A protein has these predicted regions:
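N-terminal signal peptide c-region/cleavage motif recognized by signal peptidases
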Residues: 16-18
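N-terminal, motif-rich segments that launch catalysis or mediate targeting to/interaction with membranes
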Residues: 20-152, 159-351
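Sec-dependent N-terminal signal peptides
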Residues: 4-13
């Protein structure tokens, strides 16, 4: 593909690996699709029993992200209790398998006991009634398990929440063979792509040049300077979803859900025991992780200092000139799969 080189200005901002996969609209879209697909089923009956009056899968889809801070509003007692009982809850949202891999295997480099595949497997077991210290080490309640499944099924379909990029000082992608290889000397963890910085404004220009319809003007906060760059992870979390919505001429998650369901998408459904489905989803997402990193170019390492005085490293990133088109197409398809797979999982648990 023809490439357009970006000269990227470095941002001093630091974003954690546990960034909000798909962003609020993406997660709500996954939940909205599932809400519509399970309507009138036994699964819907059980979902309603676990949710509070007026709640829906769309409405609770962002709950596991909202517990990370106050950006959704004040923390509820339920959120505080969950956070206190799950000190590693931010690690539940992703796994860091090298994107060059084809499969997720327990114990491989980048996997962890508290990663997204293990969390989904545990939450599924809880809804199946398999609540033992071995199957439910975090003591998730049935309501928590449902909410986590709703959210994590979205997360696991986000390419950068499964396939991780490891990089050398000069910006070469490398594949660590074991956890100890990632030593921040020869091999660096890009933190889910958060330490790769892309030029936000230039990518938007590329989107418009590739006939992606213009979006709504972004509100600016008085006195707050606009960041010139954004993490590559944030691009995949939010920008690709925004482009996907714009390409379908939809503005809300519900509109997106209605539009894609009406198109009767061909979605490959999972087979086998539902406890294996998170593994199948991770393997499938690795296909798109490879595509996310295809034809991008990473510059040399640049040291940065966080507000806490900690040193971390960033790399500038160049993307192909048409990158907004394939990346937003991937986002659309992954959101659709997330919604359909969530509905199928709930119906498999509650036939």
């Amino acid at each position: 593909m023809k490439k357009l080189a970006f000269v990227l200005a470095l941002s001093g901002a630091f974003v954690s690996t546990s960034a909000l996969a798909w962003g609020p609209d993406g997660h709500r879209a996954v939940g909205a699709i599932a809400d519509k697909l399970i309507k009138g089923t036994n699964a819907e009956k059980h979902v309603k029993e676990l949710l509070q009056p007026g709640e829906s899968l769309e409405g609770v889809a962002n709950w596991p992200d909202c517990v990370k801070g106050n950006y959704c509003g004040p923390q509820s007692p339920e959120m505080v209790e969950y956070v206190n009982a799950n000190p590693k809850h931010q690690e539940y949202h992703y796994t860091d398998v090298p994107f060059q891999f084809d499969h997720y295997h327990d114990g491989d480099v980048g996997t962890a006991d508290d990663d997204i595949v293990q969390t989904l497997k545990q939450a599924i077991a809880v809804l199946q009634g398999k609540d033992t210290p071995q199957t439910n080490p975090h003591h998730f309640t049935r309501r928590q398990a449902l909410i986590l499944i709703t959210h994590m099924t979205g997360d696991i379909h986000q390419p950068l929440h499964v396939g991780a990029a490891y990089v050398s000082k000069d910006g070469t992608f490398v594949v660590p063979k074991k956890h100890g290889d990632i030593d921040a000397v020869g091999i660096f963890d890009s933190r889910g792509g958060n330490n790769f910085l892309v030029d936000d404004a230039k990518i938007e220009k590329l989107a418009l040049a590739n006939d992606i319809p213009p979006g709504e003007p972004k509100p600016e906060k008085p006195g707050v300077p606009k960041n010139l760059t954004k993490p590559f992870h944030s691009y995949w979390d939010g920008t690709t979803v925004n482009y996907a919505f714009r390409r379908l001429r939809t503005k809300t998650p519900d509109q997106f859900a209605q539009t894609v369901i009406a198109s009767h998408p061909a979605v490959t459904m999972n087979t086998g025991d539902v406890s294996t489905w998170p593994y199948q989803w991770a393997d499938d997402t690795l296909i798109y992780s490879k595509q996310a990193y295809a034809d991008v170019t990473v510059g040399p390492l640049t040291p940065q200092v966080s507000k806490k005085g900690e040193t971390y490293y960033t790399w500038t990133m160049e993307v192909p000139a048409n990158y907004p088109v394939p990346s937003s197409a991937i986002a659309k398809n992954q959101l659709i799969k997330g919604g359909y797979h969530l509905a199928a999982l709930l119906e498999a648990i509650w036939p």
